[in-house]
């Protein structure tokens, strides 16, 4: 064995200097890094071990840089033990979030081990601004061929691909995984499930999941999360039931399960999930802040603000997301005063929680649903003035909708034109909707519609169905009795293969969800439902109800009877009729609808709540409506 003595004092006796050490030696060596006592104090191996031990004590970048300088001055770079030390320095600089320094260290090394590549790829994968660099590093690793990727390489490359929605890049990595023989590795497969799930390729994610020779809890969580993220709520809950045969759920599992219940709008399922959490989960899981926040969101979205507030009040520890969940919950239920009161509590000296952009979205929604224009303007200004939060597109969308729906359409248009970013289809449609509700001139409505109809943005923001603006414009024409123009809109939609998104409403009875589409005749109780609709119509007409035919603009304009019949068969009316047949008298009827409630159905539901003496809760695309005794919680402002 060749032993090299290390002489570190005086500095002039050191025989090797690395170029990167220039600029590092301006820092005096830390007391944590004393020089070797004499040339014969240790062997080279002991010296490397000594430096490695010192590396374990580094607590910040200042100490690490001094250690790096010491390593450069007292070791030979070609020694395997030195390369191992460089890998440790890479790892520490990454853990101290100094990725730029990690790159400098990496670039100063001639031959890189798999560990070095993996360390830098991992650092980039964890840094939001450098996700793409992680994939580029992986490609460079393959091109150089210094070392092969291993099972530690792929999970972080896949994580980076998932973040940038790099489906094609991810497929390439998948091929490399198979080529290098890691197709059966549980950690690699977890990364593939996360990748495909993030890109919306649920079939591929499920294929990887089903073919795994072994699964971890992360495997189940990743698959359940992917299903929930893309609206496959029933499948997610079914997979959760299967998971319980092999694993105990953790906090991540329960967050996904509660999100699935919220997505279904099922209060009974949400209550079951809450009971499961308390009965079968570890105490730490049940008390976890993130899980509690998911509980609050679930109860808010399932229509029970009382339970949401009960969970909130029972929390021993709250974070900003806890407050935001309650503010958004009150906002979507039209309880603006409570939302604003919660905000005041949140920012007072006792709680001293600093709001973020999500907080102000909730406040603006609250003001929007109650028509509090001045308060909305105050919060919009406060966000910038007091908290230095730059308004995003979502904030502008809220304030524009608030101002326009209050009747200040010209002011809303001026704000849209002065926005620092391009308005999206949602903003233009909110202006068009305000024109429809406020009886603005047809000419102004047409001018607004030209900014959106037929554009790519309208198509994308309508979930692939670009009917939104067409339907709104047709309602403007219908309200003005311009039926020829309504016909032109219908013809344009037909020529472009555009159809109105079908309304769909669901109601849950005895744990079973029943789904209805507009004009549906597929339910086993269709005959009784249609008979009940006739009873409802007769009783409402007896107290003066007249259908608002302008709410069915796309139905044959020459046949008023067809329009009235079409309105009677809207999906929420079928669901309400079904509820009246199958629920005990005076039991609240809970409806979950995919579209915004139309004016006529809103009026009808108010009357049903009075005539049949029942509470009806409708969650539509925008908000909750609580109908009782002939009135609605929205105060007819939605």
From Swiss-Prot:
The keyword Chloroplast applies. It comes from the Eukaryota. NCBIfam families: PPR (TIGR00756). Keywords: Chloroplast, Mitochondrion, mRNA processing, Plastid, Repeat, Transit peptide. The gene is PCMP-H51. GO terms for molecular function: endonuclease activity; RNA binding; zinc ion binding. Belongs to the PPR family. PCMP-H subfamily. SUPFAM superfamilies: TPR-like. The keyword Iron does not apply. GO terms for cellular component: chloroplast; mitochondrion. Involved in multiple sites RNA editing events in chloroplasts. Involved in the editing of the site 2 of ndhB (ndhB-2) and site 3 of ndhD (ndhD-3) transcripts, which are two plastid-encoded subunits of the chloroplast NAD(P)H dehydrogenase (NDH) complex. Required for the activity of the NDH complex of the photosynthetic electron transport chain. PPR repeats lie at residues 82-112, 113-148, 150-184, 185-215, 216-246, 250-280, 288-318, 319-353, 356-390, 392-422. GO terms for biological process: mRNA modification; mRNA processing. It holds the Pfam family PPR_2. The DYW motif is dispensable for editing activity in vivo. It is found in: Plastid, Chloroplast; Mitochondrion. This is Pentatricopeptide repeat-containing protein At1g59720, chloroplastic/mitochondrial. Residues 511-541 are annotated as: Type E(+) motif. Interacts with ORRM1. Interacts with VAR3/OZ1. Disruption phenotype: Impaired chloroplastic NAD(P)H dehydrogenase (NDH) activity. Residues 542-638 are annotated as: Type DYW motif. Residues 427-510 are annotated as: Type E motif. PANTHER family: PENTATRICOPEPTIDE REPEAT-CONTAINING PROTEIN. It comes from Arabidopsis thaliana. InterPro entries: DYW_dom (IPR032867), E_motif (IPR046848), Eplus_motif (IPR046849), Pentatricopeptide_rpt (IPR002885), PPR_At4g14850-like_plant (IPR046960), TPR-like_helical_dom_sf (IPR011990). Residues 1-40 form a transit peptide.
């Amino acid at each position: 064995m060749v032993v090299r003595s290390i002489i570190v004092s005086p500095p002039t006796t050191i025989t090797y200097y690395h170029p990167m050490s220039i600029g590092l030696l301006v820092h005096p060596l830390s007391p944590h890094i004393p020089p070797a006592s004499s040339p014969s104090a240790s062997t080279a191996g002991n010296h490397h071990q000594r430096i490695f031990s010192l590396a374990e004590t580094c607590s910040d970048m200042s100490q690490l840089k001094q250690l790096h300088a010491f390593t450069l001055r007292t070791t030979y770079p070609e020694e395997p033990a030195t390369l191992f030390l460089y890998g440790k320095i890479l790892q520490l600089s990454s853990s101290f979030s100094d990725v730029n320094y990690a790159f400098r260290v990496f670039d100063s090394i001639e031959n890189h081990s798999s560990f070095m590549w993996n360390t830098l790829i991992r650092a980039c994968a964890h840094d939001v601004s450098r996700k793409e660099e992680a994939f580029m590093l992986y490609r460079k690793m393959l091109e150089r061929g210094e070392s092969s990727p291993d099972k530690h390489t792929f999970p972080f490359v896949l994580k980076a691909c998932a973040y940038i929605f790099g489906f094609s890049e991810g497929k390439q990595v998948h091929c490399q995984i198979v080529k290098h023989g890691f197709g059966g590795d549980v950690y690699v497969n977890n990364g593939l499930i996360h990748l495909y799930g993030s890109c919306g390729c649920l079939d591929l994610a499920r294929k990887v999941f089903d073919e795994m020779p072994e699964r971890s809890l992360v495997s189940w969580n990743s698959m359940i999360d992917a299903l929930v993220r893309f609206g496959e709520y029933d499948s997610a809950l079914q997979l959760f039931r299967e998971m319980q045969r092999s694993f105990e759920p953790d906090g991540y599992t329960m967050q996904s399960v509660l999100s699935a219940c919220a997505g279904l709008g099922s209060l009974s399922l949400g209550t079951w999930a809450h009971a499961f959490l308390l009965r079968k989960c570890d105490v730490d899981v049940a008390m976890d802040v993130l899980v509690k926040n998911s509980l609050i969101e679930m109860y808010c979205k399932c229509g029970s603000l009382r339970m949401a507030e009960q969970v909130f009040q029972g929390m021993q520890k709250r974070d900003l997301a806890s407050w935001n969940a309650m503010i958004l919950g009150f906002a979507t239920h039209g309880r603006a005063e409570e939302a604003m009161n919660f905000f005041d509590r949140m920012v007072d000296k006792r709680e001293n929680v600093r709001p973020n952009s999500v907080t102000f979205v909730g406040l603006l929604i609250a003001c929007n649903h109650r028509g509090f224009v001045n308060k909305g303007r105050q919060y919009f200004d406060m966000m910038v003035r007091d908290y230095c939060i730059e308004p995003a597109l979502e904030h502008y969308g809220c304030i524009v909708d608030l101002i326009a729906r209050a009747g200040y359409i010209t002011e809303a248009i001026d704000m849209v034109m002065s926005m620092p970013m391009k308005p999206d289809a949602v903003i233009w449609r909110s202006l068009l909707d305000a024109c429809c509700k406020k009886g603005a001139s047809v000419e102004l409505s047409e001018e607004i519609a030209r900014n959106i109809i037929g554009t790519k943005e309208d198509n994308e923001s309508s979930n692939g169905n670009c009917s939104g603006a067409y339907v709104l414009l047709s309602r403007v024409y219908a309200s003005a009795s311009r039926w020829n123009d309504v016909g032109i809109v219908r013809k344009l939609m037909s020529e472009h293969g555009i159809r109105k998104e079908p309304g769909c409403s669901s109601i849950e009875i005895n744990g079973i969800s029943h789904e209805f589409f507009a004009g549906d005749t597929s339910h086993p109780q269709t005959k009784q439902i249609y008979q009940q609709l006739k009873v409802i119509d007769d009783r409402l007409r007896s107290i003066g109800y007249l259908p608002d035919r302008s709410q069915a603009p796309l139905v044959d304009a020459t046949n008023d009877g067809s329009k009235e019949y079409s309105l009677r068969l809207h999906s929420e009316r079928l669901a309400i009729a079904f509820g009246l047949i199958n629920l005990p008298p005076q039991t609240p009827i809970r409806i979950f609808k995919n579209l915004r409630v139309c004016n006529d159905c809103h009026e009808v539901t108010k009357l049903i709540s009075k005539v049949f003496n029942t509470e009806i809760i409708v969650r539509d695309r925008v908000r909750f409506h609580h109908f009782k005794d002939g009135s609605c919680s929205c105060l007819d402002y939605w």
